[in-house]
Amino acid sequence: AAPVTYRSVGLATYLGLQNLYITFNGYNPMIDARMTSCSFKEAEAYSVCGRIPQGESRVLVVASAGNSARAFAKGCSSGRIPLLLCVPADNVEALWFDKPLSSCVKLIVTESGSDYFDAISLAEKVLHSRHFFDEGGAKNVARRDGMGTSFLSATTTIGRIPDYYFQAVGSGTGAVAAWEANLRLIEDGRYGNHKARLIVSQNAPFAPIYEAWQAGSRDIPHYDDYHARRDAAIIDAKVLSNRRPPYSFAGGLYDALKATNGDAVVATNAQARRAAKLFKELEGVDIYPAPAVALASLIKMVESGAIDKDACIMLNITGSGEESITANKDLWYLKPSKVFSLTADIDDVVCSVEELFTK
């Protein structure tokens, strides 16, 4: 399913904004939004899967804090593509589905108390086996192009490139995808020749991108294991807890923010919860903590006078509608096939995961 962009009335009136456009990634039949995974990761999952060569015999590996796992599981199950998900044990409640998945989808987890980075580390151990391959993350053009559909949806609906782009980020790949889509639209020539200002937001206290940007640094500050796991446990938006985002390398988030005169901001759990409540009251549907962080950041900037009330603003609601799609339904949860300690030996991991797909 595709993102749906519409001009806000309720939220826009509340904030005093003349041109607020919401790009909705999720489930809301009232606006014909049909992403049953309730996440914008659904757009990237199908584009990544569509790019896998025919005859590929290896198993796709995806590390996730939750929403990517749900989206890839849905896509790979429907396409019968062998998939191994690596997720922190404390995030498995995100792996709900409206129907059982194909047995080609398997889940392994890192022990309780671990975070997204630990899931990535586990995936790296799996990839020592020649029977598995990595989906590629931010470096996979299919992933960026999939997420870039949100920006394309907004621009083609509005009829012009927006002035501002708001999104909460963990890796920042979605914002990079928006920047790349923006550049292509400039080349197209029908929607303007300017770059939307990227305003990315993080959920405090887990905010390595914010800290690096505010320090004027291209490098993400060191985040030791203890404090990273502690902060990841504190924040509501678990999907934003990436310790090592693709920020520094050429063409990454730092370059995207620089090129667009962008900014990085933060929102607390309390601010995000208020924003989520406001969105449901004014726009009529629930949103996840991550887009609530983005909305909270927009509210802060509007209230501080940092944004012209006449500006054309795109708010990327990256996940929404779980309450609607799960109401009065018996859900099916993907259960872990194996729990690994943080110190699991590479050979043990490889042996275990190979057995999962040979049984």
Task: Please identify what each model-predicted range represents.
Residues 1-359:
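PLP-dependent amino-acid enzyme catalytic core
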